[in-house]
Amino acid sequence: MKKRMLVCLLMMLLAVFSVAAAEETRIPVAENDRLALSLSVDLCGFEVLDKQTGVTWSSSMNDPTFTGKLAGLNQKKANSLLTVNVTNLVKGAGSITNAVLLNESQLGASYDLVENGVILHYDLATTGVALDVEVLLEDESVLVRVPYERINCYADFSIVSIDMMPYLCAGSDNADGFLFY
């Protein structure tokens, strides 16, 4: 009986610890009557909680069920908010390079809180591209934009395309929701 009681107490402590650890990896950003937006501490992803249903949407595949199924660059792509595809204008080779946030060795990342959301500032120094991403709560929606005037290509590279939230995940298979580009 004592062993069973000890195991139950340990399981309760582990559950409390894992919830506390999960909360430490997110920064609360904005909230309205329906949604709550939080940012990952590495500034490369966010989560949106639907307060009415309890469902959480994530901008990345941070679900433990995916652990080990992807490796290397694919894992970093799956957990990055965006991938910037660039080409070298000086070399003129026409080849496209993927600049993945979590693969960027010289990533400069910061954020500013704004009304109803956050502006993420990224500087991908390896490719010489800096850009801002706005994530805002508007009523029952999440608006994600990369304003043209906040893109700066300061080296030999130019942006070909931006893959925004390539692996946006719903909280469960039966959760309603839409994604528009």
Question: Could you say what each language-model-derived stretch is?
Answer:
Residues 23-181:
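N-terminal accessory beta-strand-rich subdomains and adjacent acidic, glycine-rich linkers
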Residues 4-22:
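Sec-dependent N-terminal signal peptides of Gram-positive bacterial secreted proteins and lipoproteins
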